[in-house]
Structure formats: structure tokens, C-alpha cells
Amino acid sequence: FIGGIISFIKKLF
């Protein structure tokens, strides 16, 4: 879901 995508992006940065 959206929250998972945001967490994934935060992990990249």
C-alpha cells in the first residue's frame, strides 16, 4: 500500500 511505498523510498534515501 502507499505507506509501504513511502517506507521503501525513505529506505533508499
Curated annotation (Swiss-Prot):
GO biological process: defense response to bacterium; killing of cells of another organism
Main location: secreted
Top-level division of the source organism's lineage: Eukaryota
Tissue: Expressed by the skin glands.
Keywords noted in UniProt: Antibiotic, Antimicrobial, Cytolysis, Hemolysis, Secreted
GO cellular component: extracellular region
Subcellular localization(s) per the UniProt record: Secreted
Record has Kinase as a keyword: no
Family: Belongs to the grammistin family. Group 2 subfamily.
Free-text function comment from the UniProt entry: Has lytic and hemolytic activities. Has antibacterial activity with a broad spectrum against various species of bacteria including both Gram-positive and Gram-negative groups.
Protein name listed in UniProt: Grammistin Gs E
Organism: Grammistes sexlineatus (Goldenstriped soapfish)
Lineage of the organism: Eukaryota, Metazoa, Chordata, Craniata, Vertebrata
